[in-house]
Amino acid sequence: MQFKLGSIPVRIQGYFFIMAAVLGANERDPVRLLMWVAVVLVSILVHELGHALVGRLFGLAPSIALHGMGGTTSFEPLPGRPARASFGTAKNVLISLAGPFAGFAFAGALYGAELAGLRTENALALRALSLLFAVNIGWGIFNLLPMLPLDGGNVMRAITRALSWRHGDRVAHVVSLVVAIGIALYALSRSQWWSVYLGGLFAFQNIQALRQLQDAPPPQRAVR
């Protein structure tokens, strides 16, 4: 499925809907399951739009993909503008933080609307609004964990690179590996199998990244 939000291309893979349905498998009512999938879709789109809009402010052309692991926003430089790889720490941190904080702002708007008296008596709508609030807060907090490839991990890497360009990536991946293992072990103790899978996957990805860094030449600082 492909469409545009304004000028931002959005592509949704079929695996995204499978992932959302699996996460909502405890919903026995088909209508409530569809509602849950819609909530996940809206929440992750809001998150990725946060990245996309801030990237656009910095002269990048964003595109959004929703897939079996959530969402990704990719950037190409606009004509005559620098690529993201040449950005300094502050811009990279702002782009990374924009996703979680877009979700927090959306959840805050929902809460503000309720305080203002904008309510509904429809039970299904109330459930959807409650889930939208919870998912946007929860997804934002999860993404702020200092673990690559999450947003918090990208913030950490931008900072460690600023502190040590030569060793920044290695430090970021080591911290990410420790956090991923911790998440997997904690989730295992609580039989939270999806979180076990995510922790294991992210641990594997960071181990692979560390192995590649061992064989790679020292990184060159981008020219700005």
Task: Please tell me what each predicted stretch does.
Residues 1-224:
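Hydrophobic transmembrane alpha-helices and their immediate loop junctions
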